[in-house]
């Protein structure tokens, strides 16, 4: 009955532990803002963690696998790992953006003021712009092109070659913006 034997059990246990910590510290006045920030940070950790995994681990590993004559090749990564990682990647990106927008509203800054870089909102507004560009890259450039690369949608060899370039540049742009 070890909850750590499944990812669902681990996640549920993490939520229970977080609740116990909050209660144990006597933080009975949990705020909407605090919950929004917590979800924003958690989703952001998943999103950027996967972004770094793709850029620092998976892309170089697939390149090495393709160049290893007689080796196993990248088929297992492309069939089993990449689709699951991309699922978490794109939905954590959306959740990060949505919780960030909600937090701006709850804080009283407002998403409009943030995007217009109004006084008192310029720094967080730049973050909102960077996050929006990154979200666009995930859903409009990276994911549709990864579907071609992974064979989820039909594409010619030329389309796949082009998709690899677009997905890589969008992913590298997101890595740059995340720093």
Predicted regions and their residues:
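Polytopic transmembrane helical bundles with strong interfacial aromatic enrichment
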Residues: 1-179
């Amino acid at each position: 009955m070890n909850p750590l034997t499944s990812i669902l059990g681990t996640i549920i246990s993490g939520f229970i532990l977080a609740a116990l910590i909050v209660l144990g510290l006597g933080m009975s006045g949990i705020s909407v803002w605090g919950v929004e920030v917590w979800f924003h940070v958690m989703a952001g950790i998943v999103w950027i963690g996967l972004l770094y995994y793709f850029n620092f681990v998976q892309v170089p590993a697939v390149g090495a696998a393709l160049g290893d004559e007689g080796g196993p090749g990248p088929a297992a990564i492309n069939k089993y790992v990449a689709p699951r990682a991309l699922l978490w990647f794109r939905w954590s990106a959306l959740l990060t953006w949505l919780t960030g927008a909600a937090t701006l509203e709850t804080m009283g800054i407002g998403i409009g003021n943030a995007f217009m870089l109004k006084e008192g909102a310029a720094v967080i507004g730049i973050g909102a712009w960077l996050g929006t560009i990154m979200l666009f890259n995930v859903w409009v450039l990276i994911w549709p092109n990864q579907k071609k690369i992974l064979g989820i949608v039909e594409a010619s060899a030329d389309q796949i070659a082009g998709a690899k370039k677009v997905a890589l540049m969008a992913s590298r742009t997101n890595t740059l913006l995340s720093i």
